[in-house]
């Protein structure tokens, strides 16, 4: 058994969930600026996440669910996941984004698990607060170590795939470190670099 851990936004999914939600809610430009800073490593991930989610306060939960049910998967996602499963990989998503989106992708792609954050809501509207397992820049690396211990899978048999600064904490615990159409801060830590927006490109490196 092997382990493959994927980032969600701009990796398994083509785009950033919070940016898409923000554009529907009319706060897109403000959120875009914060997201860009976070992914390039210029802003602390925890602070940037809190600031972005706060801008969604008052958004209807039903609209959030509708948007998250219709997010576009990255080119080649289904084919890559199917092949990984065929090769006896446990396939998991770690996301600094939201359960509303990752749980639907888990069902669609047949992932083994999804770890992400929760958008708090009250009376059918977002409160502007967020909590969960992936709140910090170090969260993905910590969760990967926990998962490896639970499953009895070594870093030698682990692949990590991501695109942004908050994916870097996974890389010390994975033999295959895939930077997928990634920011420079992640590319310099990778040993596999994919330039084309097609996850099937990873198949050649398995």
Swiss-Prot record:
Q: Where is the active site?
A: 7, 9
Q: Which cofactor does it need?
A: Mg(2+)
InterPro entries tied to this protein:
HAD-like_SerB (IPR050582), HAD-like_sf (IPR036412), HAD_sf (IPR023214), PSP (IPR004469)
Does the record bear Amino-acid biosynthesis in its keywords?
yes
Instruction: Name one molecular function that GO assigns to this entry.
Output: magnesium ion binding
GO cellular component, alphabetical, reads: cytoplasm
Q: Which CDD domains match?
A: HAD_PSP
Please name one Pfam family that this protein belongs to. Answer: Hydrolase
Gene3D superfamilies in the cross-refs: HAD superfamily/HAD-like (3.40.50.1000)
The Swiss-Prot or TrEMBL record describes its family as follows: Belongs to the HAD-like hydrolase superfamily. SerB family.
- What gene is this protein translated from? SERB
Q: What is this protein called?
A: Phosphoserine phosphatase
Organism for this UniProt entry:
Wolinella succinogenes (strain ATCC 29543 / DSM 1740 / CCUG 13145 / JCM 31913 / LMG 7466 / NCTC 11488 / FDC 602W) (Vibrio succinogenes)
Q: Does the keyword Ion transport apply?
A: no
Q: What is its EC number?
A: 3.1.3.3
The pathway is:
Amino-acid biosynthesis; L-serine biosynthesis; L-serine from 3-phospho-D-glycerate: step 3/3
Share an example GO biological-process annotation for this protein: L-serine biosynthetic process
Question: What are the protein's UniProt keywords?
Answer: Amino-acid biosynthesis, Hydrolase, Magnesium, Metal-binding, Serine biosynthesis
Q: Where along this sequence does the record place binding of Mg(2+)? A: 7, 9, 163
Report the catalytic activity.
O-phospho-L-serine + H2O = L-serine + phosphate; O-phospho-D-serine + H2O = D-serine + phosphate
Detail which positions bind substrate: 16, 52, 95-96, 140, 166
């Amino acid at each position: 058994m092997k382990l493959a851990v994927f980032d969600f936004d701009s990796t398994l999914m083509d785009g950033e969930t919070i940016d898409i939600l923000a554009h529907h809610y009319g706060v897109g430009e403000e959120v875009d600026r914060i997201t860009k800073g976070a992914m390039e490593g210029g802003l602390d991930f925890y602070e940037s996440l809190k600031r972005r989610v706060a801008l969604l306060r008052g958004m209807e939960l039903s609209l959030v669910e509708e948007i998250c049910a219709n997010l576009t998967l990255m080119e080649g996602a289904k084919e890559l996941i199917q092949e990984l499963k065929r090769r006896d990989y446990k396939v998991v998503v770690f996301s600094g984004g939201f359960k509303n989106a990752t749980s639907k992708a888990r069902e669609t792609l047949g992932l083994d698990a999804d770890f992400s954050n929760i958008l708090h809501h009250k009376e059918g509207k977002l409160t502007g607060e967020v909590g969960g397992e992936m709140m910090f820049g170090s969260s993905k690396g910590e969760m990967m170590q926990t998962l490896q211990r639970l499953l009895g899978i070594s870093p030698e048999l682990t692949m990590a795939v991501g695109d942004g600064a908050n994916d870097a904490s996974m890389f010390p615990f994975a033999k295959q470190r895939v930077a997928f159409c990634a920011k420079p801060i992640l590319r310099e830590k990778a040993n596999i670099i994919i330039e084309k927006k097609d996850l099937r490109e990873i198949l050649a490196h398995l």
